[in-house]
Amino acid sequence: MYFHILILNHTLMKKKSYSTYNLTIWQHIWTIILLFISISCIKQYNFSFQSFNRGEYSNFTTFDSFNKKQVCNLISFDNALLKILLKNKICINTIEKQPIYKQIQICPDFCRLIFTSHSYNPIGIINNVSDLSIIGFVDLYGNKWEEGSAFIAHKYFLENQKLPNIIGINNMNSYKLAQMCFVLKNNKSTHSFVIDLRKEKNIILINNLGKVNIGNDFASLIKKLIFLKSFTSICKEGDDILSKIDINNLSRPIVQYSSYL
């Protein structure tokens, strides 16, 4: 492109009986400036086109329609939830504009937490679930509760008694307007929890018991959930975690495990 601009300058200068080699320093400077502007515009156009093709505006449809070879850049995890996860020593690297496999680390000796993107470019794929897993899933696109991806994941679990192949997390800048699905697994006992974060003062926990108001202390809830790293040693095989929770006082969930907080 630089040479094209030089040719243009040469054509203009030729009319004035000047040679290309006699271009002034300012003409070279303006040529370089135009070159950088052109490159910037091209990059911006490509970014917008790729973002549209990635499916950022499409709804979540199925758990089996992903290309496992795809990777994408981290959208944004610089928020309250990320700080909670990092504070509690869950290994998540958030190097901007790096391939996802370089951003996500899984701690084998801790709760296994796998995040994927929305309905495109999976970050992590669940194959073998460890003894204890906490899997976050957020969806911002469901206009109704029943249309949200977290609800779909929860329903999938209840109907099939197994985890979906892929569950993920989307842009968390507006996480208060999202849904999140947690799946806790202890040997043969597995339970699915869906939290509705779309209300500022009311977080809804959905499990086999239905909808329950657990208050607005989202940070405390997440902290207590992820600190169930000794869950397998506390509960015997086949124990029901719901029996360990005081359903009438879920503003302080899983208080029996406070010694691990």
From Swiss-Prot:
Arranged from A to Z, the UniProt key words for this protein are: Chloroplast, Plastid
At the top level of its lineage, which domain of life is listed? Eukaryota
Listed under GO cellular component are: chloroplast
User: Where does this one sit in the cell?
Assistant: Plastid, Chloroplast
The name under which this protein is listed is Uncharacterized 30.4 kDa protein in rpoZ-ycf20 intergenic region
- Species annotation: Mesostigma viride
